[in-house]
Curated annotation (Swiss-Prot):
Gene3D superfamilies: Jelly Rolls
Function: Oxidoreductase; part of the gene cluster that mediates the biosynthesis of aculins. The pathway begins with the synthesis of 6-methylsalicylic acid by the polyketide synthase (PKS) acuA via condensation of acetate and malonate units. The 6-methylsalicylic acid decarboxylase acuB then catalyzes the decarboxylation of 6-methylsalicylic acid to yield m-cresol (also known as 3-methylphenol). These first reactions occur in the cytosol.
Name of the protein: Oxidoreductase acuE
Keyword Oxidoreductase tagged: yes
Family: Belongs to the oxidoreductase OpS7 family.
Pathway(s) served: Secondary metabolite biosynthesis
Gene from which the chain derives: acuE
Organism encoding this protein: Aspergillus aculeatus (strain ATCC 16872 / CBS 172.66 / WB 5094)
GO molecular function: oxidoreductase activity
Keywords from the UniProt entry: Oxidoreductase
InterPro entries: RmlC-like_jellyroll (IPR014710), RmlC_Cupin_sf (IPR011051)
Keyword hit for Transmembrane helix: no
Amino acid sequence: MAPFVPYHNSAGQSKIVKFGGLLTTEFLEPPPGRCFLFRQTYRHNVEGPIPDNLRKLINSPDRPKGPPPHFHQFQTEYFRVESGVMGINVDGQVKRVTAADGEVSVKAGSVHNFFIHPDSEESMTVYLSASDSGMDYQLDRIFFENWYGYWHDALLHDGGLDWIQFLAIQDGGDAYTPAPAWVPFRRQVGYWTCVIVGRWIGGLLGYKPFFREYTTDWDFAVAKMKGSFFQRHLVHDAYAAEKNWDAQVALEAASRPENAEFEPWVQDMSPKALVLPPVQYEKGVFVDGAARATLSGVNGHANGVNGHAGVNGHATNGTNGTTTGAEWEDVVALKKRVANGANGVNGTNGVH
């Protein structure tokens, strides 16, 4: 099967309700020396109209009455019943626990599970906590948020637990499923099965122990996964750069007011012809009256130094632009000669 994708979002909720109210968990501030504390209620049944898949689950042997048998390699777990009757199985011995029994503990390494006892009339409420091992993977709020979230979604929507995903989440919370009782070294086999299959193989295949949809303290969960070579590739850090809503609104105020749909789709980059008005001369003067130069003066058009027909000019053979010396030429003839660009200095035949 492909790695699991959550069906709902319960991150950020101190009180989470699963299976339509069959299981309710309220996270509380843990006392010193404990890494978590929550108040949990299991019910025998759910009143009122409920979805068909939930009713089918409640009537099946897989209905949630408590977690499956497991053990904690490095932590001691504590239970204190508030109301109802809790049943607890520790290393094969079943005990009935009520509020009168006070707090009971299960030592690290003991195979155990607890459940709502049949003697409870309607529900069972119990406080759970555990010692703080200081390790990355341990029983804490992150683990329980993800375990109860996955348990709910897998049973209601996927038809059951995915074995690899289950082991990956269990390994993320120092909760390991033991091998069957007839297997020698059942705890060691169970521990390494969770680590090898859940963390190593599962991590390489994309199975995560934690999901952002379930996790309130996601930064802490990311730090946990970064500690594993097999899971760090599953972590994405871009979320940390995401701006909050107020910052996004501030960015919007500085943007252009036009929407994109009003922007031009394309710009016309096709070449256009350069249109210039005709140049008209009248005896060396533009029609608009702006004086330019005489035909025979210095820098003039015909006979002066650097004129059009002299040095650097276009038309005549003289060094400094002597067309005829002292003669006037017709303006029309001069324009034609200038346009033809013949024989001046820097022209075709003149002095270079």
